[in-house]
């Protein structure tokens, strides 16, 4: 929604019903064309937006993103429980900001505490798709708008695991045979 506002630092001050209407409108009135996959980035937690998306959109699955911090894990655990209660399939778990590789020694430093990715994946009954390190190069490329230039082994492995976790696209039989 931020892209629809006059200024990028304008706040979206909407309550639940207006947010739900906007989500429904995006889903029903945007001409998405033929999609193999539509990714929807949601705010953390179980508030109006994630709840509306999980209840209103025909989801084939969700990917849970967490970080090692205790507070983040508590919030994410609630989202996992919400997905289970709403019978939404959890396709996988990703742990962001999992560690930093020291440029001097090459040693992994767990800036935000020990990894909890495996525990979260176990609780979610889903595979751990990967762990994303804190990487100053990635931050710089994001800020400069050049993220497509980023290349790292952890990110490549995560991308492959993420693609494998996605459901196979539904295509007519003639498309699958190459005709």
Region annotations inferred by a language model:
Residues 14-21, 37, 44, 48, ...:
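Charged, alpha-helix-enriched surfaces in structured cytosolic catalytic cores
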């Amino acid at each position: 929604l931020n892209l629809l506002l006059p200024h990028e630092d304008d706040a979206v001050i909407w309550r639940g019903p207006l947010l739900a209407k906007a989500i429904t409108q995006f889903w029903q009135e945007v001409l998405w064309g033929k999609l193999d996959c539509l990714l929807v980035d949601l705010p953390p937690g179980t508030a109006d937006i994630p709840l509306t998306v999980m209840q209103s959109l025909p989801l084939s699955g969700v990917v849970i993103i967490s970080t090692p911090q205790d507070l983040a894990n508590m919030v994410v655990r609630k989202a996992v429980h919400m997905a289970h209660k709403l019978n939404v399939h959890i396709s996988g778990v990703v742990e962001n900001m999992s560690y930093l590789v020291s440029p001097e020694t090459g040693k992994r430093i767990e800036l935000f505490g020990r990894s909890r990715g495996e525990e979260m994946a176990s609780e979610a009954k889903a595979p751990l798709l990967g762990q994303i390190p804190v990487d100053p190069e990635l931050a710089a490329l994001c800020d400069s708008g050049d993220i497509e230039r980023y290349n790292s082994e952890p990110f490549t492995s995560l991308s492959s695991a993420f693609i494998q976790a996605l459901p196979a696209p539904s295509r007519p039989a003639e498309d699958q045979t190459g005709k």
